[in-house]
Regions:
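Glycine-rich, flexible N-terminal cofactor/catalytic loop recognition
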Residues: 1-66
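A contiguous loop/helix-start segment that scaffolds small-molecule binding in enzyme catalytic cores
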Residues: 10, 86, 165, 172-287
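Generic beta-sheet signal
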Residues: 12-16, 85-91, 139, 164-168, ...
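Short active-site oxyanion
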Residues: 34-40, 113-117, 165-166
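General beta-strand structural signal in soluble alpha/beta enzymes
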Residues: 42, 118-121, 168, 193
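Conserved helicase motor
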Residues: 65-71, 145-148
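Glycine/small-residue-rich loop that forms an oxyanion/phosphate-binding "nest" at active or ligand-binding sites
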Residues: 74-123
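Class I SAM-dependent methyltransferase SAM-binding "motif I" and its flanking Rossmann-like core
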Residues: 104-162
Length: 288
């Protein structure tokens, strides 16, 4: 007897969001599609197999698709779709392509006029900011910052002048280093560290960055993938010294702009005295 819940899918690329922790955090539509597609391209086939087993989906044809084989696997998947197959893409957790593999595949699919179907669902970034208590009307998702200290610091200096709420991903091994770098560059801003979201040991560490650092430093170890939400920079008035410095340093990178012009631009942006900012510009310029 035919399964009444089984659906017939058109050939195409289905971008399917999966749970970020709790295996029940998946949409009914996603389950129907995972059950019906010809192939599932999975970042971690073993993890996906557990998800399918939990929801009693049998007979799925899994294909590994991750950072290390993305280049070679992409044309193969496009070819399968061209020949009439339906292919679902899933990451280990959350929405595919959001700090996960898949960009090359989508780019090639667009170039080949392949049908692309989003199947939305869980996202750690959205889950974290929704419970952060920080402004949610406008935000910047940065994902994972560079692992090398120099490149990471450079990016943080660029972000120090960002007014919108910032969202970062980081591994438990490196999250304390990231927190310290952000505090050094951006000042002691409010933030929220979300850990093990939707799982048994779900935790949210809130407060100034210094307080979050202190809490984590007192622990013997940190477990679980982490999402860090940080307050954006001040818009007017009392600007953190680190934010002001980062803004000036960005201006100094433009060799064609005069020191006076840099001071005028920064002063206007933050509602500060031009003379005060000009003094800072001169001081930072002399340090370089």
């Amino acid at each position: 007897m035919d399964d009444p819940e089984h659906i017939q899918l058109e050939a195409g690329l289905y971008i399917v969001a999966t749970p970020i922790g709790n295996l029940d955090d998946i949409t009914l539509r996603a389950l129907k599609i995972l059950k019906a597609v010809d192939f599932i391209a999975a970042e971690d086939t073993r993890h996906t197999a557990r998800l399918l087993s939990h929801h009693r989906i049998k007979g799925a044809r899994l294909i590994s698709y991750h950072d290390h084989n993305e280049t070679n696997r992409t044309p193969e998947l496009i070819d399968r779709i061209k020949r009439g197959s339906s292919v679902a893409v899933v990451s280990k957790a959350g929405t595919p392509l959001i700090s996960d593999p898949g960009y090359r595949l989508i780019k090639m699919a667009v170039a080949h006029h392949t049908r692309i179907i989003p199947v939305p669902g869980a996202s750690a970034a959205i889950a974290a900011i929704s419970v952060s208590g920080l402004p949610t009307d406008s935000f910047v998702f940065e994902g994972f910052l560079p692992r090398t200290k120099g490149n990471r610091i450079k990016r943080l200096k660029e972000l120090a002048v960002e007014k919108r709420t910032l969202i970062f991903y980081e591994s438990p091994r490196r999250v304390l280093t990231l927190l310290k770098d952000i505090q050094t560059i951006m000042g002691d801003r409010p933030g929220v560290l979300s850990r093990e979201m939707t799982k048994i040991y779900e935790e949210f560490v809130r407060g100034k960055l210094s307080a979050i650092i202190s809490t984590l430093t007192d622990r013997s170890g940190i477990r679980g993938e982490c999402t860090l939400v940080v307050m954006g920079g001040q818009i007017k008035g009392d600007v953190a010294e680190t934010t002001l410095r980062a803004e000036i340093e960005l201006g100094l990178q433009n060799r064609d702009e005069t020191l006076s012009a840099i001071a005028k631009t920064v002063a206007k942006k933050y509602g500060l005295s031009k003379n005060r900012v000009y003094e800072e510009v001169l001081r930072i310029k002399n340090e370089q």
